[in-house]
Amino acid sequence: MYKRQLKAKGRPVKLTYGRDEEFAATVCRSPVHIHMKTGVKRDGTLTAQKVEIQWDAGAYVTTNPRVDYNAGFAANGPYKIPNAQVDAYVYMTNKTLGTAYRGFGVTEVATAHERQMDRIAEKLGIDPLELRLKNVLQNGDVGITGEIMQTMAVKECLETAAANIGWKDLPDRWTDEEGNLCGKGIACFNKLTGTPSTTSVLVKMNENGSLYIMSASTEMGQGVTTTLPQIAAETLGMALEKISMAPVDTAITPYDKTTTSSRSTFHSGNAVLEACEDIKKQLCRLAAIKFGVAPEDVTYTADGYIQGRA
């Protein structure tokens, strides 16, 4: 590989693995077996749940113990379960190395507990949405790990999602005009994220009224280069087309801890939000000086205009 780089003489080098090399030198999402047993009343109230999680780490241990911890934390979902037991294990085998992928253990257990909720709803003849709404954690409830819930909005999220897709008006299954088989489904989950941590962004308003966002949050398919401009556009009341993102370059972009753990929208997004709020204040102060009025007599409107008090 080193010789190939020398031969390239400064040009980009592409490394392509063969099939054997792919399995020997790279990683995969760890296989997992999840067994879940749930106690529930006839009216759909959850009373107990026992979960056993078995991760296959492959030949070496990387992030598997942390993935296992994360999965155990989220194994019961965002539900009120007065009696719960979770046993989570990581095994080493002679297989391909497994490690963390998107979701960090939550993707797998969410699939398990939401499929369990659907099966319970089916057996009891209860609407899957109503079963979830009946059991979701709300502010003041105590989760299975002893945490007191403070900012839970799962109920509101479910209700909003159901309203947006017309849940009550749709049958469970149907065929559309083109002959495609269609169905409906709804699910919810909770995830431990990398909080608290530090994120910085730089938001610059240019002379022509366009906006430039500098952030070290890396775009890898999760949509951060779309999300951050959307937050800025909504905050400043300006067109999305007038906002651009700087390429990530650690030499010039502000510090960000990592682009991991579902943290970019919350951390970088809030940093952009606060920066845009500061821009609004600065523009109002400049306008007050320009027109010789008191700063409190100048406001920034939702559609991006600065106006004085009539």
Enumerate the predicted regions with their spans.
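Structural alpha/beta core scaffold segments of enzyme domains
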Residues: 3-310
